[in-house]
Amino acid sequence: MPAVPVVAPRAIDLATLQAIADLPSEPRYNSQRNLGRDLMLLSFALGGINYADLYALPYDAYKVDYIEYKRQKTQHARADEALYRVYICEEVRPLLTRYLDPTRKRLFIFHRRFPAGNFPTKVSCAVKAVEKAVPFERHYTYYSARHTYATLAYNVANIDKYTVHELLNHSDKEMKITDRYIERDWQRLYDAHKRIVALINWSSICEG
């Protein structure tokens, strides 16, 4: 059996995440730091969503109480096409509303501001601006929001590891058959997600 690759730690701690949320908005419309802050927090608020999915979400993914989408990275490896729902917590609605696409061509406006091919670079530069303002003991990136979501879920919110696995919408070969028999309890996942999102105070970001 091939060895499982070791992934270097990418999570930041709760205090650093809160400091990012508390970063005051810069007055410039095209502020890299504002964008990076909001992208990190959007990812955390939406269960560690990756930027490819965030960019491509269709408007009809928005179901008022939750966002429903198929995770691009694993949709072709699973019978359910990696279908997932992430609950929209009330405290983060102002942040989501800030980026909704008024044309409704997609859920968020990123496709109108950045060509698809440039978006990864824009995300990287934006998060670097955040990192400069809020340093941590090791380098972090956009994907640190996903790692932080999982780490805080398990270590701080005391959510069991399998529920964290479900919240991340991971594909597990060992559980593939079993998962076909189990109907998802979305309310259980929503409740767990709420506990994670509630770990930080969103008032500063939602006022900004």
Features from the language model and the residues they span:
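Short, polar N-cap/turn motifs at the start of nucleic acid-interacting alpha helices
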Residues: 60-68, 137-138, 159-180, 202-208
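Catalytic-site neighborhood detector that most strongly recognizes the C-terminal catalytic loop/helix
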Residues: 3, 71-76, 168-198
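C-terminal catalytic core of tyrosine-transesterase DNA break-rejoin enzymes
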Residues: 41, 45, 49-52, 122, ...
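Long, amphipathic, Lys/Arg-enriched alpha-helical "connector/arm" segment
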Residues: 1-35
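C-terminal secondary-structure termini that scaffold catalytic or DNA-interacting sites
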Residues: 90, 104, 111-114, 174-176, ...
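Short, contiguous acidic/charged loop-to-helix segments that flank catalytic cores in large enzymes
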Residues: 26-30, 72-87, 110-118, 136-144, ...
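Active-site/catalytic core of tyrosine-dependent DNA strand-transfer enzymes
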Residues: 11, 17, 89-137
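Conserved tyrosine-mediated DNA breakage-rejoining catalytic core shared by Y-recombinases
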Residues: 56-98
